[in-house]
């Protein structure tokens, strides 16, 4: 009986991992939101966020998880952000140290700005956990558009991330997200270019 239970759990875990690994999210279509939020930690993320703002798909950009020692001018130079864009539309969040604190930092910024819709930018393999953490922190009614930066993760990266996702959901009391609304992707052919860039 115990062996059957263990075998069943192993199968559930294995199928869950396969589903996670083979259904990574895609870049989002041309859809307007109040803001775009970028979580640092992977190439292409910041470039994607900047492109979204420059195309007028979001009013402002918040970069969560920037090193506290990085000054706005240094950030602008590293990522080639035009001064006009940096001054009007880019805010650096420098308190977060992991995905959960990203969610807290983003939530506070959105509340301060009174924004109710946001484009979430992170790497494709990280999106599920990032969205899970956001769903537990964001105010009810917040609309979220997942905008994944495509990557080519190896098996080790996927395995580690899947286990982090499970741990995050267990610590939250199992998957949440009913309080926020995922924005439907309606124009899959019109996606921003991946671009270059990386974590701050």
Residue spans of the language-model regions?
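A structural signal for short, hydrophobic/glycine-enriched beta-strand patches
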Residues: 21-159
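A general structural signal for short secondary-structure boundary/capping elements
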Residues: 66, 81-87, 164-171, 189-194
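Bacterial Sec-exported substrate-binding components of ABC uptake systems
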Residues: 2-3, 199
